[in-house]
Amino acid sequence: MATTIHSSSLDFTAIKNNLKTYLQQQSEFKDYDFEAAGLSNILDVLAYNTHMNGLTANFALNESFLNTAQLRSSVVSHAETLGYVPASKSAAQATVNLSFNIGIDQEDVPEKLQVSSGYKFTSSVNDASYTFQTQELIEATNDGNNFFQFQTLDGSTEIPVFEGIAKTKTFFAGEDTEGTLYIIPDVNMDRSTAVVKVYESATSGDFTSYINLEVATNIDVTTPAYILKEAPNGYYELSFGNGSTLGAVPTAGSKVTIEYLSVDGSNANGARLFEPVNTIEVTEPTSGIGLERLPVVSTTNRSVGGSAKESLASIRKNSPYRYATQNRMVTHADYASLVLRTYGALIDD
């Protein structure tokens, strides 16, 4: 009776020996020399094919489960089935005081100054240069002596600046807007800085600001919500609702823009000195003459919070807990999951 081939081992030599033992016990091959070049080569091919098939089956099965998957694309995909979107890279953030003194002798000075979002600074960490910028409008009021202290819109003199290069990607919606995926080819995107706008047409100046579906509290057919998640190749894909239960969907021919920061993550942590890149123009109200001044910058908090993409170990740990919380904050585990999601760049799991 023929000996059964043992198929539990993936070792190439063991597979070849098992094949040889099996064939030697077949009457058709009783007097064959299996060490001869011809038969040995045939056994090598059979063993190699069996070895590769076994490895492929083993790898494929491992990639089918969250706990055993090794490829990032597989882990991210499994997390997605639990409603979990792994964290992207995050920008390092610092706070600065920003001011300048035009001089008490200067006449015809405006009462208020405003600087739009995107005012840039440079800094360095370990001899590498990084760009930081504001993410909101800041303004300053003349104190009566031509001194201007800039503040955020909520009145704070500590102005947050974020590391990264501002980028904008533009798309045009086609006919099948519900199933369209818009790919942003940037592995360094900070998802939290994304701003999505949908214009009525390519030439229209009117737009609707869309919100991230993750933070939407009430979703219906008119809710302007977007979905932004990591694609299998490490880029990011933008999509919209279905026009009913998941919110509004852009109409065909509309223009879609996404603005975001492309960041260096943890490399930019620890920046202390910030140099303004551009002057701030002060226009005299009466004459219309523009004066340009470099503001004085003082650091109140060095840059922190920059991080790499969420690790595979962190995704495996956090995604089941996130699924269990369902965005609630009731049990201690709910709080732990949501705190890790919000402040994961600042604390350890």
Describe every region a protein language model picked out.
Residues 1-349:
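Signature of Asx- and small-polar-rich beta-strand/turn repeats characteristic
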